[in-house]
Amino acid sequence: MKGHDDFDGWYKQHQEIMKTDKLSKFFNNFRRVSQHIGVSPYGGGEFSDNKILHYFGSSKDLPDVPKEDIITSCNNYFTSVVELIYDAYLIFGASIDAQQYFTSSNFVTLGKTIEDAEEELGLPRGWTDIGDPDAEEYRWEALRNTTTGCEINHIFEQYLNKIIACSDKLPPYVPKNS
């Protein structure tokens, strides 16, 4: 994404948010301490009400640990990371999601044609052309059908109750002369 229009500003904004977020700071320090120093921040656990809960333990290298149990802390942090990725899909979707990339509107923005899209997919130029100029959206749909889309929508849905919308499926193609 480096060099992408607006990415640096977007990323800087998110870095500032992460720097002020207690869980983000903790997990950044957690990684540093566990990987580079070798300290395990596991503090212990408890069993009550038929539940086992584990907690982080503080140390001189990791003095500030979450009060919540490990599972809750990890889920909350993971959700914030998923939110960041979801935002990236919304802002930069055409650069990271083939379903958003291979659209007429995106290729117009790029100054490219459907034949350029065909070529990018390794197909001969004009491969989807059936001789009907009104069938261009069907051509785009055929190209999108050869690609993957947002393959983490299930994660967005599970953690955020949101999904990245794909192009609506077109009704069956009917030639004008039918």
List where the protein language model places each region.
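Acidic, Ser/Thr/Gly/Pro-rich intrinsically disordered interaction regions
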Residues: 5-178
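N-terminal ordered "arm"
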Residues: 1-2
